[in-house]
Amino acid sequence: MTTVFALALNLAILLTAASAVADERRIANCLACHGEEGQSQTPDVPSLGAQPTQYTLIQLFMFRERLRVATPMNEETKGLSDDDLQNISTAISKLPPPGPPPEAGDPQRLAHGRALAEQNHCNVCHRSDFAGQENVPRLTHQREDYLLKTLGEYKTGARHGYDATMAEVLQPIDENDLGILAYFLARAR
């Protein structure tokens, strides 16, 4: 009986170690595109650092099930189990948040962007510091180009959220103001 227990314990330890190595490889694959420590340096590719676990899990699930289509992400998530998605999401949430761009930014554009964020109640779902929560993404210090692309996709309906909220909120905002909002969120302090 002791031998069987010892074998079972050793097998469990080996499987746990193998799973941890597999998770590390998957995270390394993520960071190859999304940047070291989850801070993207690649145009139109989002930074992942400190994204809420639940938000990331939902996005990975949507990529895996092709409910959200982006070929590289659909390929990376194909065949991953729910546990794999959970482990990746948890690891991503523990990465440091992305830092702001090196330049402080134009005070007038930042003030206009802050006013737009307040006027459109971005702080209600994304929190007052725009760090996101639960199934709502972190926006603070996200890549400006990615923010602009994504805001435009929500506005036109090319990208769907969990409901129509984002499309409704963004509908009255013109293209120039979308750019200013993205500028502000990338630099919000």
Question: Where does each model-flagged region fall?
Answer:
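N-terminal secretory signal peptides that target proteins for export/translocation
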Residues: 1-3
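Bacterial N-terminal signal peptides
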Residues: 6-16
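Sequence/structural segment immediately N-terminal to covalent heme-attachment motifs in c-type
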Residues: 20-39, 100-101, 105-128, 143
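Protein kinase-like catalytic domain
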Residues: 34, 64, 126, 155, ...
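Gly/Gly-Pro-rich "capping" loops immediately C-terminal to redox-active cysteine motifs
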Residues: 38-68, 74-80, 114, 118, ...
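Inter-heme linker and motif-flanking segments adjacent to c-type heme-binding CXXCH motifs
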Residues: 39-40, 69, 94-108, 129-137, ...
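C-terminal capping alpha-helices of c-type cytochrome domains
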Residues: 78-100, 145, 171-189
